[in-house]
Amino acid sequence: MNTDVEFHIRQNYPWNKLPANVKQSLGNSQREYDKQVLLYSIRNQLRFRNNLVRHVKKDERKYYEELLKYSREHLMLYPYHLSDIMVKGLRVTPFSYYISIMEDIMNCEKSYDSLPNFTAADCLRLLGIGRNQYIDLMNQCRSSKKFFRRKSARDLLPAKPVEITVEPWWVVQTGYITEDDIRICSVAEKAAIDKMIDSGPQLAGSMEYNVVLSLYNRGYIYLDVPISDDSCISVPPLEGFVMNRVQGDYFETLLYKIFVSIDEQTNVSELANVLEIDLGLVKNAVSMYCRLGFAIKKGQVISPDQLHPSWKSAPSVNRLKGTMDPQKMLLSWEGGSPVMEAGSSATDTDTTSLEDQDTASVSSLSIPAAPTKRIAFLFDSTLTAFLMMGNLSPNLKSHAVTMFEVGKLSDETLDSFLMELEKVESTAEGEAQRYFDHALTLRNTILFLRYNKDLTPDQGPDVPNIGLPLDLLRCESLLGLDPATCSRVLNKNYKLLVSMAPLSNEIRPISSCTPQHIGPAIPEVSSIWFKLYLYSVTGQGPPSLLLSKGSRLRKLPDIFQAYDRLLITSWGHDPGVVPSSNVLTMLNDALTHSAVLIQGHGMHGHGETVHVPFPFDEEDLKGEFSYSNMCAHKALKILRDKVDLEHQCGYITMLNHNNRHRRRASDADGDAELCGVLDANGSNESFELVTEENNGDGGKKQGTEASSSEDEWVPLELCFGMPLFSSELNRKVCQRIVSHKLCSKDSLQELLHSSRKLALKVLSFVQSFQDGKQPADPDSGVSGPLSQPPAESGVPLPAINLLFKDGELKEWSGRAPPSLHISAPQRDQPT
């Protein structure tokens, strides 16, 4: 549907008030507009009254029946905001709605994964049917077909809801109750119904707990989860969330947008203003979080004298269990363990209060302080995949699911997260070691960034400097917000953004001038273009050939004939090292749908790589080049003059093609462990390069020092941010952030200016290879949930083939010698 048409429907514009251009887009047909109004209203589950649809559809009951049918067919969440209509008018309770959905998908023999995430979570809550239960039901359904008396799917489904969690501040409303229903009620149930009929809706906590459950199970009442303008909520690690699929309907999209934007200090009204979303929709979404148990309402929600005695033994919505005093969680990133207050010992922990802490809400973990801006650590989905796949500790998965689905792990939940990371062992075997390394390095990074007084300037003698809180944010979730909204959310809550390094090429990095960003300044800095920019300004780099989409190779270019291993980067995907012997078919397949960068990596097996952390220390720069003092390399000295490495942090990967003098222990494990292989879509097995580089980072062996010369090493890539794949590299970067005072006000101001300069230079460099008519390729990346921008969206594809060889970047025509020198002057430009 046209966005202009949607806007005018949302604003209740009748046909005669529509602008001429909108009418023209509808073919000047009022009937077409009426069809769009009805479709939009049903898709967005709009109430009949006070909306434009009432002028289009005269029969209110029929409209709601169509809405319910559409929602059921598309497996949408039950429209709880229309409960008064659905339950009282149509006698369709949430239980009966989800039973019909389950019956439909079982009759069609669909998999459990066909249920969208939030719908599956609500089915689990009400029906008690999760993945395993669904598989059992399907097996029973199929086996019954073999016998004469086959059972229908409905016969196998539960007859009444499982016992749900009800919070005392929820509101109980009467549903559709007949005289026959009243006759079978107990005395207490009749009294409760009479009170609601006479006095109106009642707080659940003021009624007898078992009566509320009994009436709900029979469908005589429904439950409202009231959210006011000034309500604040907290989101603990998700329990009971089902990771199936993202559907993309209006409400699910809204739920994900609010997930990543919400925080404990911002009330619902303020959040609606920041997101520029209708307040009623935001309340509906927050109400749904609380209903599903994914969020907890903060503050005193019901006074103790209102609470019926029966509620004392009632179960509560899942809560984050805190087992440490937050005042004792001021952590030392150097020591890696909590810094206990003077005079305290391990036995000083208040063990008598642990049971109370188990049921405490998330807010009890936060260090009492006035609302303050925070540091945001930006990560991508590969990190959450590592935390999920590694089976690292029993309760770590719920945090990883929260990081992926909510897109955020707030400071209030980091105590629990750190305790789970503490349980991760430091050693593992094979592939699992990579997951363990990332988990342990992530823990060290959190300890370093969170409440680190070395990262924040003193506020004065009256204000104690304890550092800043830390939130973890998933880049893909932020990209689900439009750029203006994302900027408002970041500016409202954060003082500094820090990216992990490297971020996956499959996502578009977050660009931000304010708050300042220690990470890629613009998406182009995380693209293939930036590699070529580095090579052109330093005059050094591996032989590299960037082929435009649609190119075709008849043979491997001569510059790569001497190489045993090539580094292949398909546009919008992560790089992989592949053998040169069988690369041609793979390259031509990838070139049909993507631009591809080919680089020489190793002449005798894999090339050797070393990571050089920056900012550089002055003492190291004054020294002579050596394997252990790589920052004295002449290419890096040139790079320092062209790119600001003093007010940023990250690492530069140096590559040595001639690695005959050393054989890694990992080489004995075979090529499968280290080589990334492009799949049919041109992507590769993720992080194959990281594995190899990580092995190389620690590979300082006897004889390497003596045989390394400066000319053997060339810069391969530069990554801004904090590396997580190597704990030693991460430790060095953390030390230099402190020693170079990167988070000081002056340094951050310099970072702002230098990031803008770098952005302009890189954009100018990219533009020099465009014909001015090259559009951004919509198929250049992989789109994910919430219709996020595709990878490298807005980053132009190359219009010509480019070759970097012998210190110069040239246009490559496919013949030797190459023509047209392009970027030799780049190295002579002043900064």
Curated annotation (Swiss-Prot):
Looking at the record, which segments are called Disordered? Answer: 341-362, 690-709, 770-794
Keyword annotations of the record: Cytoplasmic vesicle, Golgi apparatus
Domain of life of the source? Eukaryota
Entries under InterPro entries matching the protein = FAM91, FAM91_C_dom, FAM91_N_dom
Pfam families found in the cross-reference section:
FAM91_C, FAM91_N
Q: Does the keyword Cytoplasm apply?
A: no
How is this protein annotated for GO cellular component? cytoplasmic vesicle; trans-Golgi network
The keyword Magnesium is annotated on this UniProt entry: no
GO terms, biological process: intracellular protein transport; vesicle tethering to Golgi
Query: Where does the UniProt annotation locate this protein?
Result: Golgi apparatus, trans-Golgi network; Cytoplasmic vesicle
Assembly with partners or alone: May be a component of the WDR1 complex. May interact with golgins.
Family according to the record: Belongs to the FAM91 family.
Function field: As component of the WDR11 complex may act together with TBC1D23 to facilitate the golgin-mediated capture of vesicles generated using AP-1.
Please give the name of this protein: Protein FAM91A1
Q: What species is this protein from?
A: Danio rerio (Zebrafish)
